[in-house]
Amino acid sequence: NGRKEDGLKAFRWILENKRYYGIRVVNISVGTTCRRAEDHRVLIAGVEQLWDAGLVVVAAAGNQGPKAGSVTAPGSSRKIITVGSSDLLTGRTAISGRGPTFECVCKPDLVAPGNHVLACAPGADNGYGVKSGTSMSTPLVAGAAALMLEKNPELTNVQIKMKLKESARDMGLPKNQQGWGELDLERFMEL
């Protein structure tokens, strides 16, 4: 529920302010199917610029599943870490985005729980509501990356991505659904 221009403006702000605020991890819990190929390319270029600047970029796979090729942009970027929802992969609630991308990249990279998550909900009486989707899964992986960087601040974004891959728990599903598997925080932090 936003405009591509707003996302690109946010990416520029992050690049301009990452040193001042010590930004190391970027969570992107949005995605679009992009009606025009150019919009898709612009969003991909924006997140890849963040990645190339050394930031750990984690984006949602989107909720367009269960069909193949349903990962949304910017999660369809080859470089960044794309997250699906481990509890929205099968059955009637199989909405988690699946690869491959338009560029034949196997996505998502991994999955994390994202069903019935208590989260901030503007307009709710107490400010909270129960939400579901890959936008709820993505912050779990971004938070795991932040914990690892707190423990090992010298790690690069590529090293974080590889540690997530090495520590993910195989769910026995096709790679275009689960990627490397489900986030295993304990195993990840032990690497």
Regions from the PLM with identified roles:
Residues 9-12, 45-49, 81, 142, ...:
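Solvent-exposed, polar/charged alpha-helical surfaces in well-ordered, non-transmembrane soluble domains
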Residues 31-33, 61-65, 86-89, 116, ...:
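Acidic, glycine-rich active-site loops and adjacent beta-strand->loop/helix elements
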Residues 33, 142-143, 183:
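A generic alpha-helix surface/boundary motif
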Residues 1-78, 102-105, 122-132, 136, ...:
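Substrate-binding/access-modulating region of protease and related hydrolase catalytic domains
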Residues 16-19, 112-116, 166:
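Glycine-rich, acidic and aromatic/proline-enriched surface loops and short helix-turn segments
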Residues 23-27, 150-191:
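C-terminal subdomain of the subtilisin-like protease fold in secreted/lumenal serine endopeptidases
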Residues 75-150, 154:
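Extracellular S/T/G-rich loop segment that most often corresponds to the catalytic His/Ser-adjacent loop
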